Amino acid sequence: MFRFLDWQDFFTAPREHKESFRYDQDTQIGWAPPGVPETAKGNDKRDLKEYFNYFSHGTCPTSLQPITTLAYQQLHQVASTLLAWIQNHTPEEIQTKFSLPLPEMILDSSQILFRINYYPAITGQEEIGALRAADHTDINLITVLTAGSDAGKLQVKMLPLY
């Protein structure tokens, strides 16, 4: 079972330790230090976070490889199950417009991202108006969120159903 605490030592390690896993703009793999994370649409401040992007063909710290690979595989299976449920409950006239059945869209895909987010403690030195994660809309086929390591701190805004 994946626990963020397994990754916490990586994120709280000195910057020099993390640099060898530095985020690569072309591959989207690796550690994105503070100041690199994106700015949410409609916001002019970067999110106050670090993250590590992991893909099945990517790399991560050796000590974290087994649990990260396992978590990636488990989340992939959850996503596949969710997509099958969505497919099964989608009206036929909409299903006919899909290029593939939804679960097949993620089979053998090299584009499935597992992002491990880290939100450092607030120091009081942050730019006014900066947030850990500003309101945003994910642009993925599906986003699977795990429970946060701090109970009750993950906020998800529900939008009206279509």
Model-derived regions: residue spans:
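Peripheral, non-catalytic segments flanking oxidoreductase cores
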Residues: 1-162
